[in-house]
Amino acid sequence: MNSPTTATAATSAPVTAVDPKSFTRFAEFYPYYLGEHRNPACRRLHFVGSTLALVCLGMLVATGRPYWLLVGLLCGYGFAWLGHFGFEKNKPASFKRPLYSFMGDWVMYKDIWTGKIPF
């Protein structure tokens, strides 16, 4: 009789639960962050949300109207959370490590632009 571990190992790699709070350095956290963004649709939604957030930041600077900050945050987080809940089927790491997740989003954004991570 197969144990749950054996059955899981036979069909796919076992999933190990990692608490994002356990990381003490961003360099340790980033590989975990990328693992939470395996689905291309999730990455694309992050990319679109980050791009729109940058546009909103530009509008904030150009117009001086503070509501662009709110719109930028809604775009950035809204698209990312849609990717996680709709496609990746996981909870965003920003719920447990908000600063590292924010940093990870911008590093991933750069990595997509430079071709290090597929769009």
List PLM regions with ranges.
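Transmembrane alpha-helical segments that form the membrane-embedded catalytic/substrate-channel core
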Residues: 75-88
